[in-house]
């Protein structure tokens, strides 16, 4: 029993556990990040700095002491907050400003002042996008299956599906040897020119979210066996990175002329506003005829927007439960989700080694893997849809946006009451 002066220890939630994993990786990389709790979002002083023990659920993480501003607004913003230093002209249209030396002790307080004087959304945090908090994508930690298990859903019977189509996967990279170990991954390429493969996981234990990008590539390839798939290691900080760095990677990816970009990461945002760097990037993406961005809808079990999936023009994907007839309990939902696809209990390529669970209720549990895993989340419904788009492109000659539009129209005709538009493997009308 605690004494009268002590507080009983509050249980760590899954959301908090995931946030801590990401924070630790950023700390090791020398990048300061702050928490924005779910309660009192946007209020001065409500953020919890890295290293503080907080009981609040984490709404989102952002870089401490920097903001994102449109190029045309830089002078106006500097007029409000003082001598903010230009850290980086990130891409054409977006500038990163440092708050060091200004009068604002926190990023949120600076943004509140900018909101009051210039309007909400002129400047935004430099959000952390991740495959974990907030939005928890994947929805579960990987589960053991035999090393010789078949992928589920299985490989499409027509091995020519996806021929001539390039799917780009900005994620945790491709595990060394995975393409040789699994026939359906043959020819899948790493996207990074330097250090193309992430470090192989040590046998005991492997790092968090190891194999996420490989699993995603496997799901996409099962739907489109002949598609060219490139997996980039961009979410290199325990499955996360800054919005600014991810956008830089996506700009570089456009040089490859992809047909489909499959992004299984995202974030909540301050006031639910669109993340500024993605807003500018998507305007640029429209100049690349036919390229479609498919993004995970997140796993909060919530109807609020999850970005970048919630942008108009992005194919946002929610998850169906294991029976394919209802929405998965973890999946986000709402009018901004375009389509639901199988996302619970999928089986595909993974790492080999020992994994130690980090999240309640299984924290501390050790699991042994032999190249395959069962995993759940909108993270994995997303490449299923990306693969179906690629497969349709190879059959019809449509570009990525045209194929996505046609599949979404079909998905609405087979909507499930109380769920929404649905896409399942093998149901594309163009096959008939």
Residue ranges, per PLM feature:
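C-terminal subdomain of the subtilisin-like protease fold in secreted/lumenal serine endopeptidases
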Residues: 258-266, 275-277, 394-432
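Short helix-loop-beta-strand segments that form the rim/entrance of peptidase-like active sites
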Residues: 220-240, 398-411
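Glycine-centered tight turns that cap/initiate beta-strands
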Residues: 119, 290, 313-316
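Protease zymogen maturation seam
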Residues: 88-98, 103-166, 178-181, 367, ...
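Active-site core segment of subtilase-fold serine proteases
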Residues: 140-227, 248-256, 260, 354-358, ...
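Substrate-binding/access-modulating region of protease and related hydrolase catalytic domains
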Residues: 4, 235-311, 366-383, 417-420
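Extracellular S/T/G-rich loop segment that most often corresponds to the catalytic His/Ser-adjacent loop
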Residues: 171, 306-394
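Inhibitory N-terminal propeptides of secreted protease zymogens
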Residues: 2-131
């Amino acid at each position: 029993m605690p004494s009268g002066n002590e507080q009983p220890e509050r249980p760590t939630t899954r959301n908090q556990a995931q946030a801590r994993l990401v924070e630790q990786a950023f700390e090791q990389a020398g990048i300061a990040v702050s928490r924005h709790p779910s309660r009192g979002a946007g209020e001065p002083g409500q953020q919890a700095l890295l290293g503080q023990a907080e009981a609040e659920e984490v709404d989102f993480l952002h870089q401490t002491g920097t903001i994102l501003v449109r190029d045309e607004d830089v002078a106006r913003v500097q007029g409000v907050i003082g001598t903010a230093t230009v850290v980086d002209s990130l891409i054409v249209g977006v500038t990163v400003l440092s708050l060091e030396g200004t009068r604002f002790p926190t990023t949120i307080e600076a943004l509140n002042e900018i909101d009051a004087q210039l309007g909400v959304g002129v400047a935004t945090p430099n959000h952390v996008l991740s495959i974990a908090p907030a939005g928890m994508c994947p929805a579960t930690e990987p589960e053991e299956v035999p090393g010789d298990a078949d992928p589920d859903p299985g490989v499409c019977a027509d091995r020519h599906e996806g021929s001539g189509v390039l799917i780009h996967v900005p994620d945790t990279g491709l595990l060394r040897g995975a393409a040789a170990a699994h026939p359906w991954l043959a020819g899948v390429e790493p996207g990074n020119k330097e250090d193309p493969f992430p470090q192989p996981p040590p046998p005991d234990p492997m790092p968090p979210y190891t194999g996420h990008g490989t699993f995603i590539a496997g799901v996409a390839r099962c739907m489109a066996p002949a598609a060219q798939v490139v997996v980039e290691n961009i979410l290199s900080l325990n499955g996360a990175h800054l919005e600014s760095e991810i956008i830089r990677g996506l700009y570089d990816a456009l040089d490859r002329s992809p047909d489909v970009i499959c992004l299984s990461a995202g974030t909540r945002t301050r006031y639910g506003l669109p993340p500024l760097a993605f807003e500018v990037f998507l305007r640029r993406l429209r100049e690349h005829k036919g390229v479609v961005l498919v993004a995970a809808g997140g796993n909060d079990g919530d109807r609020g927007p999850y970005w970048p999936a919630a942008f108009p023009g992005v194919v946002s994907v929610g998850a169906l439960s294991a029976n394919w007839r209802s929405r998965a309990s973890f999946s986000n939902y709402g009018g901004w989700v375009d389509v639901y696809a199988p996302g619970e209990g999928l089986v595909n390529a993974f790492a080999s080694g020992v994994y130690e669970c980090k999240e309640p209720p299984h924290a501390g549990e050790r699991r042994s893997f032999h190249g395959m895993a069962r995993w759940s989340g909108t993270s994995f419904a997303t490449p299923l849809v990306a693969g179906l788009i690629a497969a349709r492109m190879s059959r019809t000659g449509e570009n990525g946006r045209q194929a996505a539009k046609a599949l979404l129209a079909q998905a609405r005709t087979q909507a499930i009451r109380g769920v929404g538009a649905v896409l399942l493997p093998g149901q594309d009308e163009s096959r008939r």
